[in-house]
Amino acid sequence: MTWLSIHFTFASQNQKKMKRIFTVLLLSIIATFANAKDIKILNSYISYAAFNVTGEKPSQYIETYITFDKSSLTYTKNTENKFNATINVTILFKQGETIKNFGKYSIDSPIENDTANIGGFFMDIQRYSLPNGTYTMEIVLEDANNKTDKPFKVEDQIIVDFPEGFCISSIIGLESYSKSDKVSNSTKNGYELIPMIMPFYPETTNKLSFYAEIYNSNKQLGSDEKYLLNTYICAFENGSKLNNYYFTKRMNTKDTEVIINNIDITNLPSGNYYLVLEARNRNNDVIGLNRYFFQRSNPNYIIDPSTLSSIDTEKVFSGQISNIDSIRRYIKTLAPISTQVEREYSAELIKTEDLKMMQQYFFTFWASRNSIEPRKAWEDYYAQVQRVNSSFKSLNNEGYATDRGRVFLKYGAPDRIVQSYNEPGAYPYEIWHYYTLGSQRNKKFVFMTLDIATNDFQLIHSDAVGELSNFRWTTEIYKRTYGTYYDYGVDQYAMPDSYGDHAKDYYDNPR
């Protein structure tokens, strides 16, 4: 049995006076009974966000959102002959071995009349006071009616760092919101907020609702001053701003500003994006910025070929590529740095015999990334393509089409690489460590191959935004040694320690 978790880390960009780093972790938590005939899986989605409280005694807090899939729980009959489930939750916030705050509680599901067709979700929201600092957040979830030998546990580092000056809270994607006078963990500044379970917007969802807070603009800029708040959507892959999704509003300075808004995304193509809040002062300097990562599925949207037809290929560098097989090959190499829409469109384009359209598309691709020197941008990129083809080519794929090649072309060369090809009991693996990855910090990629002779290393885990994450990745590396344990301990997220097992140490402490 294989297990896959989804892990996104959303980080705010460090901008001058805005030094606060915010991380959102989205986990697909799975725990099961081993070797049970009827396996019941606890499926939960967890995210968290950071907020500030201004005033004479400023403070900070983390807000956690745990959403449970009701159909994944084990139900028991209560005294009223109805059914409910119970989940035990433990959340620790630690610095070293010192626990700075914690939550230990049980959550009861909504009451069900019967268990035949249970569906839907329910959410638990909690708040934890945490002063500025770096913490390890440890989460343990257990179905009280379906206990395992070891409940599923996961850890992640969070950084709370609200400066005294201008700063923006984390951005929450909202399922819905409404005005409310109630006081509860789901209300904030006069609104009842229901966060999104996951940052995924299918074609049936055409509105992106969000909430954020802006702090201390009056302290930094002065009372009765103004600043610009830009709200826009940009491509995750290259940061390019989408023209139809850029909004500007002049704001008055105050202690705390509540931002709650909607954006129509009916015509937003499929892909990975950031929703960005960016504040600028009178000198047009960026004084605050934060981002919300989300995914959009909109299969009805396609690139309009008429937008390319105006390009005169005789006047641009791509017109000099007259061999159709060559330009097909060149377009294929763009996949690692393309948006989803570009990948889908180009995959269909290269199936045709339309050389001119390929030339027009190729130029447009590079002009959108470097309008001044598109040819140089392509030549620099192609030099890297040749490098990865030389280093990462496998039996069946050119280097750019392999997982290592894609990561290298998308993010650049890693700062450190651990290569472990001969560790006893382990499949050959590599761990790549990036000190910085755009606005992200300290991100890692784990690759593994079943046969070193093929040079075909597959990505099995990363903690970077939008990348595959599997918190049981060590079980993949060591499963030929711990095969029986791997099959039995399906609720485990790591192999037992033994002599010669170094993967986790290499991951935590890159050489």
Predicted regions and their residues:
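Charged/polar low-complexity intrinsically disordered segments
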Residues: 13-16
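Short beta-strand micro-motifs enriched in acidic
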Residues: 31, 53-56, 448-450
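Hydrophobic h-region of N-terminal signal peptides that target proteins for export
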Residues: 27-35
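Sec-dependent signal peptide recognition
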Residues: 19-24
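Residues within mature, well-folded domains
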Residues: 240, 252-256, 266-268, 295-299, ...
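Intrinsically disordered, low-complexity terminal regions enriched in Ser/Thr/Pro/Gly
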Residues: 37-272, 278-324, 489-511
